[in-house]
Amino acid sequence: MVVYTNSRKVRTTRKTNVKLILSQHDYKCGTCIRSGNCALQSIANELNISEMPYDSILEKDNWDKTFPLIRDAQKCIKCMRCVQVCDNIQGMHIWDVVNTGSRTTVNVRANKNIAETACTLCGQCVSNCPVGALTERDDVGIVLDAIENEDIITVVQIAPAVRTAWGEDFGMSKEYATAQRLVAGLRRIGFDYIFDTTFAADMTIMEEGSEFLERLPEIKESGLPMFTSCCPGWVKFVKSEFPEMAGRLSTAKSPQQMFGAITKSYYAEKLGVDPDKIFCVSIMPCLAKKDECTWDGGKDVDAVLTTREVERMFKAFFIKPEELDEDEFDNPLGEGTGAGVIFGATGGVMEAALRSAYYLVTGNNPDADAFQSVRGLEGWKEASFDLNGTTVNVAVASGLGNTRHLMNAIKKGEVHYDFVEIMSCPGGCINGGGQPYKEDAVMVEERRHVLYGLDKRDNLRFSHENPSVKQCYEEYFEKPLSHRAHEILHV
């Protein structure tokens, strides 16, 4: 039997199907952020569709535009990818097919307002939407307003995972799209100070690692672990799905929030300025970070931009990153270690914490790769390590579906851990909902290799050896878990 896959009949049928999809899609490509990187646009171009014989029937929806995740109903093509990833990978069941007949569409389950659901803002639905019907709330405008205000000092921090992906849409290789070229571009846009969230990741390790060692006797007695608190998607998840476990979270702020708190206390004092004059911006691979900066406890961070938003800023400023010379982070909040860099990959927080916990217990550094068994993209990993005669059982999970299985096993007493790291996005922050759009898992593996390569080549691979962290404690916080540290760096 001969099967023809590109006959006139097949081509006509494909074109008709795509035209029918387009008839329910707002194809104003010139104003769509997915233009040039849109599956539907690509197919329409490949099929040479130049006219539409059908009238457009576009869905109307009143979406809360203040929510960090935005849905444009007129762009939705009912492909069900958001439903599939939310149900089958993340297990959150936020999206569903609603209404009947010609009014059938995809929307929030039970026609709820998105803010009323258990949505963690992991953003995996956004990453998998092929047409731009789901996007992040654009906060570029308020950031540019702050930059142009001469009375405001703009400070920006760059998350570890961002350096693995920011150059992808510009066609830059991983080796060329360095954090230093990103710094150069941001300086051209007009930020006053450009720092590295890796510094705050090292601070987080000092606080969280010390907290773990302090809580370890109680952990052993209760049989319940301490959980990391770096991922706001995970924090929202545990509070809504397993509220009885919320008290097991580390009290240390996430690196983003810790950086903001340090900027508006220690750094403001060093500059001799009113903290209210500082506008702190985060560049994150994540939608949930936009929500985290609004949580109770003070306005540590004023605005969060995703990696994609920064790419659009570069294009709006006609910046060609491939032509930029490298520039260095500002100090003292711009110095990080390899331990802080690997925060962007699943298992990275755990490995970094164990490196410094070993030092805090023994007074000696372990081999920097002694805890690498927690690395990898598996959804749920576990390991046991000896800390000066005490066996520490740890687990690492990424993806909320895997996390739910882990949490249920802990509740049932099927597994017992002392320390657990959770990231809401499969693979960790490198696969965050604010990263450049990807078509396969290969890109995630490449991003992971970038982080571990940076760690391997770094002269400093232990958070406790970061000289800027030491300086910060000597000049302001005294020591991890001090009274001032608890007031400013913990919730």
Describe each model-derived feature in a short phrase:
Residues 1, 10, 14, 136-491:
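Iron-sulfur-associated redox domains of electron-transfer enzymes in respiratory
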Residues 1-121, 127, 134-149, 153:
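Fe-S ferredoxin-like electron-transfer domains
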